[in-house]
Design a protein with these regions (language model features):
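A hydrophobic transmembrane-helix motif
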Residues: 1-43, 99
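An intracellular "coupling" helix at the cytosolic face of ABC transporter transmembrane type-1 domains
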Residues: 1-19, 57, 61-64, 80-81, ...
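ABC-type nucleotide-binding domain
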Residues: 77, 84-353
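Ca2+-coordinating acidic residues in Ca2+-binding motifs
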Residues: 37, 71, 171
Length: 353
């Protein structure tokens, strides 16, 4: 192995170094070389050893860096498995029917069990649904299929009765805004953190214009990020995070508001929120969803949350268990059903009593 060879070479180098010392000392004792020559040679050996160690260190660093480069080139060589259909069509300019899952099953590559099994439901245009269930129920997997980060193992997903695999990928993802629970904290300016939610707007604006600034303002108001921006010394031009000089670190809740603004900036037909307010306090969460129901009027939305106070804003709630849909209906209907949803709701409610 690499460490074994490194040990052998180090031992040989040490033996050669001290072996040379023994030879010149013996030659000095026998009178073949003078004491001055001994001093000169010993100093030369020491300098030569330092030089050789430096060279070996450089080779070791080159070898280490080449491994990183190898990983980088391997990454560049990866070919996407989800590709456009040869006869792709654009996402509907305005959804009329919505999404439909038809007996969808899915398991991750190299996995033994299905993450989702036999799932059938609809998400109507303009409807807001909530996905509820315990960890591992398949909620996040479902929204990955909606965004076509994966294709179903079995079954089909339709958008306005068009197979989602026939829709242009760029067009599909432009019309879907997603905030995952592990959202990314970008060490950019506040403006860049928000506008990166819609790259087309950045590229089309050679300089800051009223239209772009207006969109930023609307997105920050929807997400309550306007309060965060107003508290920053340089406003939208403030660098966020501590990676760069003069950067300002935000709290978890403030970062989450910035991430929400990024999603609103896309102005998509479908907004997916995966635990979007997990870092917000109760008051901020209430304000966010109070605005959410008003501002998402006419647009579709999927909310994933373990907070039952949050999912009540949805038109319909889907309760998932072991990758299957076991209950479906409004909050009132599911409470009347007195099934798994009601059980978990009452369990959570008892914690506040």
């Amino acid at each position: 192995s690499k460490s074994t060879w490194a040990g052998i070479l180090s031992a040989l180098g040490t033996l050669a170094y001290y072996g040379a010392y023994v030879v010149i000392i013996l030659q000095t004792i026998s009178g073949l070389i003078s004491l001055g020559t001994l001093t000169f040679l010993s100093g030369s050996f020491k300098r030569m050893q330092s030089g050789l160690q430096g060279i070996m260190l450089r080779f070791s660093q080159i070898s280490s860096h080449s491994l990183y480069l190898s990983d980088l080139f391997d990454f560049f060589a990866i070919q996407p498995q989800i590709v456009d259909h040869p006869d792709k069509i654009p996402f509907p300019e305005k959804m009329q029917i919505g999404f439909r899952f038809e007996n969808v099953s899915f398991k991750y590559p190299d996995a033994d069990r299905y993450a989702i099994r036999g799932l059938s439901f609809t998400l109507a245009a303009g409807e807001k649904i909530a996905l509820v269930g315990e960890n591992g129920a398949g909620k996040t997997t479902l929204i990955k299929l909606l965004a076509r980060l994966y294709d179903p193992t079995e079954g089909n997903i339709y958008v306005d009765e068009i197979d989602i695999r026939s829709i242009d990928l760029a067009s599909l993802r432009k019309n879907i805004g997603i905030i995952f629970q592990d959202f990314i904290k970008l060490h950019f300016t506040a403006r860049e953190n928000i506008t990166i939610g819609n790259i087309d707007d950045i590229e089309s604006a050679n300089e800051l214009n009223g239209s772009l600034e207006s969109k930023i303002k609307i997105a920050t108001q929807k997400s309550l990020a306007d309060e965060v921006i107003s508290s920053l010394p340089q406003g939208l031009d403030q660098m966020l995070g501590r990676r760069f000089d003069n950067g300002v670190e935000l709290s978890g809740g403030q970062w989450q508001k910035i991430a929400l603004a990024r999603a609103y900036m896309r102005d998509a037909q479908l907004l997916i929120l995966d635990e979007p307010t997990s870092a917000l306090d109760a008051r901020a969460e209430h304000q966010v969803f109070e605005r959410f129901t008003q501002l998402m009027d006419g647009k579709s939305a999927v909310i994933i949350s373990h907070r039952f106070s949050t999912v009540r804003v949805a038109d319909r709630i889907l309760f998932l268990e072991n990758g299957q849909l076991v209950e479906e209906g409004s909050h009132e209907e599911l409470m009347e059903l007195d099934g798994r949803y009601a059980e978990l709701y009452n369990l959570q409610a008892r914690g506040y009593q």
